[in-house]
């Protein structure tokens, strides 16, 4: 299992990039080895989300409430669906029908540990920008950035007009997305950890 990496975007937030076909969710406490940890009233191992083809399936470890109905069997997640793990409410969204990438957001007062804006369940691509179909909304950006998978590696495609520098050097072509890289442009500033 690959632990999610965190994408920090200046002025926007921090996002867990979940690249595995199976993501575990549970309570945040020392020694708990879930992929996505939540500070809240939730069991240590509450659920698993599996990628099945282009879809995501919620596999409850404890009973969950999906749209208000108690479920203890696998549930196919749909755009906009809300589910509760203990007293923690989560919303699943798929902003673009052209991508299997989805977004998990906590509703209410609970928080991810480490502190995140959202968790991104990666498919083959992830779009960052101001548009409503972007997986990561960056309201002040006039350009879109595309993260895409090629083989087992992730790449970043940034428009030429964005004047982007990678570790201080101007970039014109898609580049591998690597931990520790600082990507900066006129509106864009982000780093993967």
Segments (PLM) and residue ranges:
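A structural signal for short, hydrophobic beta-strand segments that form beta-sheets
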Residues: 1, 92, 192-193
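Hydrophobic, helix-prone linear segments
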Residues: 1-22
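Short polybasic amphipathic segments
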Residues: 3-8, 63-66, 102-107, 162-166
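Glycine-centered tight beta-turn/hairpin loop motif at sheet-sheet or coil-to-beta transitions
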Residues: 10-12, 31, 85-87, 185-187
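Surface-exposed beta-loop interaction hotspot
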Residues: 69, 73-131
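A generic structural motif
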Residues: 7-9, 50, 107-112, 149
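Forkhead-associated
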Residues: 17-79, 118-187
